[in-house]
């Protein structure tokens, strides 16, 4: 939450208070990385599920508040192991490649303010869901 507050403060200092309707450009992007626990959790994981759901709710509230002001806020659900190694597990889609996550986050950031993705589910290609 502190990261979001400080990021927003900096975005408004750098780009002003004008809204998109007033002709302002996009000010920036804040991406929250969550897990499947933000949507549902298993028994005996109530506290984990509550903490993940609260991050998702924060992202949704900020998206509603900041979208018109030119700040793109997104919540991603990274449902799988993210590996920074280029190996058989990442090449085959057993694990999520960190580079693929980075490219996806860049794609989110580069979206035009007329259409923004606010939630995105990231899963390894081999995962059964």
PLM segments and residue spans:
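Hydrophobic positions on the long internal alpha-helix
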Residues: 3-7
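Broad hydrophobic/π-residue packing in well-ordered secondary structure
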Residues: 1-2, 48, 53, 77, ...
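C-terminal helical subdomain
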Residues: 68-129
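Catalytic loop of short-chain dehydrogenase/reductase
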Residues: 9-54, 59-60, 64-67
């Amino acid at each position: 939450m502190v990261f979001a507050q400080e990021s927003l403060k900096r975005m408004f200092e750098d780009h002003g208070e004008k809204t998109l309707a007033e002709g302002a450009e996009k000010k920036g992007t804040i991406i929250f990385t969550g897990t499947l626990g933000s949507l549902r959790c298993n028994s005996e994981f109530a506290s984990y599920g509550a903490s993940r759901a609260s991050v998702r709710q924060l992202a949704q509230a900020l998206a509603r508040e900041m979208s018109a002001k030119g700040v793109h806020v997104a919540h991603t659900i990274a449902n799988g192991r993210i590996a920074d190694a280029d190996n058989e597990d990442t090449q085959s889609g057993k694990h999520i490649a960190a580079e693929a996550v980075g490219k996806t986050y860049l794609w989110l950031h580069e979206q035009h303010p007329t259409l923004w993705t606010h939630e995105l589910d990231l899963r390894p290609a081999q995962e059964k869901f």
